[in-house]
Curated annotation (Swiss-Prot):
Record-linked SUPFAM superfamilies: V-type ATPase subunit E-like
Organism: Methanoregula boonei (strain DSM 21154 / JCM 14090 / 6A8)
Pfam families noted in UniProt: vATP-synt_E
The encoding gene: atpE
Lipid bilayer topology: Peripheral membrane protein
Name of the featured protein: A-type ATP synthase subunit E
Keywords, in A-Z order: ATP synthesis, Cell membrane, Hydrogen ion transport, Ion transport, Membrane, Transport
GO molecular function list: ATP binding; proton-transporting ATP synthase activity, rotational mechanism; proton-transporting ATPase activity, rotational mechanism
GO biological process, one term: proton motive force-driven plasma membrane ATP synthesis
Length: 191
C-alpha cells in the first residue's frame, strides 16, 4: 500500500467522521429546534388561554357591573314610584270631607284616652273645627285644644304637664301600614 492509498484512506475516514459529526449535529440541532418549537407552542397556548380567561373575567365583571347599574336604576325608579304613591295617599286622605276627619279625631281620641285621660290635643289648622266639635262632647271634657300642629291630619295628644305624648297623626299610621305592607305592595306593583 502506497502512501497515496493511506492518504486516501485517512481522507475517507475523515470524511466519514465529518459526515457523522454533521449528521449528529444536524440531529442535535433538529432536536433542539423541535424542543424550542414545543416550548414556543406551549408558551403560546398558555398565553392564549390566559388572555381568553382574562377576557372572560373582564367581560363577566363588565356584565355584572352593568346588571348592578340597571338593577340600581330599577330600584330607584320603583322607590320613586312608591314614594309618589305614599305622598299621593296622604294628599288624598287630606282631601276627604270634614266629617271623615271629625270621625277620625273622635276614634283616635277615644283610643288615646285609655293612656292619657286628660290633656291637650293638637291637630292641623284644617281640622280645628272638627276637633272643637269632638271636644264639645261630654266624654272628652278633660281635653282642650292646643295650638295647630304641622301634621297632615290626625291628632297629637299631650298629657297634663306635657310628660306623656302620643302621636296619632295620619302620617304615623300611614308609616306603620307602609312599612308592614311595603314588600307586598312592591311585589304587586313590580312583580
Amino acid at each position: 500500500m502506497g502512501l497515496e492509498a493511506v492518504l486516501e484512506e485517512i481522507r475517507e475516514k475523515g470524511r466519514k467522521e465529518a459526515d457523522a459529526i454533521r449528521a449528529e449535529s444536524k440531529m442535535d440541532s433538529d432536536r433542539i429546534l423541535a424542543e424550542a418549537d414545543q416550548k414556543v407552542a406551549g408558551i403560546k397556548a398558555e398565553a392564549e388561554e390566559a388572555s381568553t380567561k382574562q377576557a372572560a373575567r373582564v367581560t363577566a365583571q363588565e356584565i355584572s357591573a352593568a346588571n348592578l347599574l340597571v338593577k340600581r336604576e330599577i330600584l330607584n325608579t320603583q322607590k320613586g314610584l312608591l314614594d309618589e304613591v305614599y305622598e299621593g295617599t296622604i294628599a288624598e286622605i287630606a282631601k276627604l270631607p270634614e266629617s271623615f276627619h271629625r270621625e277620625a279625631i273622635k276614634k283616635l281620641l277615644t283610643e288615646a284616652k285609655k293612656e292619657i285621660p286628660k290633656g291637650k290635643i293638637h291637630c292641623n289648622a284644617r281640622d280645628e273645627a272638627a276637633a272643637k266639635a269632638v271636644l264639645a262632647e261630654k266624654e272628652f271634657s278633660g281635653f282642650i285644644l292646643g295650638e295647630p300642629a304641622h301634621i297632615d291630619g290626625g291628632i297629637l295628644i299631650e298629657g297634663e304637664g306635657g310628660e306623656l305624648q302620643i302621636d296619632y297623626s295620619y302620617r304615623t299610621f300611614m308609616n306603620k301600614v307602609w312599612e308592614s305592607g311595603l314588600k307586598d305592595a312592591s311585589d304587586i306593583l313590580f312583580g
